[in-house]
């Protein structure tokens, strides 16, 4: 695990974005941890979040021309990541995002920001069922662009209804890499380093053994 990944876990814990306990997910599955990226909700939070996303992008080595943030959660992520890439990595790249409803006046259309073209890096918080990715792919393909990859904050590394995860389904269906700032394995590694979190480690390990991919 790299330093920025460890720092991201501590950032998420500090902001209570990442919590341990017993949580019932939308699927009905009981999880020993919960991740709610919506709690990154101040200016400083967003500035830091953008730096972690930018670090993961640079670390991945994936080549891309533009950042795309699917409405709604992906919008601030794309914006802050673009700023962080320019300020901290000297990479001044365009970004855009979609509207849920297309405008019929003013600039019109369903996109805001740069023209959607070239190799597109999609940024979002998490992938649960992959629905937002599929909707975004329709937009990307309609503009003649290609998907270079997808970056999310946390890869839960668990299977959904089938034997593979929603992330693996996206990789299979669109032939792209899905990368993340951290994975469930990183979280387990972090817990292993913290004796005071031993009770959570046992629960997360058990969950991984039952549902992990």
From Swiss-Prot:
Pathway annotation: Pyrimidine metabolism; UMP biosynthesis via de novo pathway; UMP from orotate: step 1/2
Biological-process GO terms, alphabetical: 'de novo' pyrimidine nucleobase biosynthetic process; 'de novo' UMP biosynthetic process; pyrimidine ribonucleoside biosynthetic process
Pfam families linked to this entry: Pribosyltran
Entries under InterPro entries matching the protein: OPRT (IPR023031), Or_phspho_trans_dom (IPR004467), PRibTrfase_dom (IPR000836), PRTase-like (IPR029057)
Cofactor(s) needed by this chain: Mg(2+)
A molecular-function term among this protein's GO annotations: orotate phosphoribosyltransferase activity
Keywords noted in UniProt: Glycosyltransferase, Magnesium, Pyrimidine biosynthesis, Transferase
Residues binding orotate: 34-35, 128, 156
Catalysed transformations (reactions): orotidine 5'-phosphate + diphosphate = orotate + 5-phospho-alpha-D-ribose 1-diphosphate
Binding site for 5-phospho-alpha-D-ribose 1-diphosphate: 26, 72-73, 99-100, 103, 105, 124-132
Coiled coil regions in record: none
CC terms in the record's Gene Ontology section: cytoplasm
E.C. designation(s): 2.4.2.10
Membrane spanning residue stretches: none
UniProt superkingdom: Bacteria
Annotated function: Catalyzes the transfer of a ribosyl phosphate group from 5-phosphoribose 1-diphosphate to orotate, leading to the formation of orotidine monophosphate (OMP).
The protein's assembly and partners: Homodimer.
Family membership: Belongs to the purine/pyrimidine phosphoribosyltransferase family. PyrE subfamily.
Protein name: Orotate phosphoribosyltransferase
